[in-house]
């Protein structure tokens, strides 16, 4: 189960990073738009954080996409 948890966090983080860079946003700009801290966004993108559902919603809203599109 631990391997799955780590893998899903890395996949999610890679998707967030891809969408962010596609928009041309720095981590700092993106974090500001989401209402989150830059270091938190960095940790999410590296797959180091077990992200809260509330923060997934903030990220999806910032990208103006459905939550499902983050996975």
Task: Please give the residue ranges for each predicted region.
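DNA major-groove recognition helix of helix-turn-helix/homeodomain DNA-binding modules
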Residues: 55-69
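Short basic helix-loop element that most often maps to the first helix and adjoining turn
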Residues: 14-33, 63
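Recognition helix of helix-turn-helix/homeodomain-like DNA-binding domains
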Residues: 36-51
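Conserved hydrophobic/aromatic packing and binding residues within compact polymer-binding modules
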Residues: 16, 30-31, 41-44, 70
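Short, conserved catalytic or interaction motifs in soluble domains
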Residues: 3, 46, 65
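A detector for short, charged/polar N-terminal pre-domain segments
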Residues: 1-11
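Helix-turn-helix DNA-binding elements, focusing on the entry/boundary residues of the two helices
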Residues: 16, 27, 38, 53-56
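Short amphipathic helical patch at the helix-1/turn junction of helix-turn-helix
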Residues: 10, 21-22, 50
């Amino acid at each position: 189960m631990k391997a799955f948890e780590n893998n899903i966090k890395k996949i999610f983080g890679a998707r967030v990073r891809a969408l962010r860079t596609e928009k041309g946003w720095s981590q700092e700009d993106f974090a500001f738009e989401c209402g989150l801290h830059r270091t938190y966004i960095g940790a999410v993108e590296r797959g180091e954080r077990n992200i809260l559902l509330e923060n997934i919603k903030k990220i999806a809203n910032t990208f103006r996409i459905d939550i499902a599109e983050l996975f």
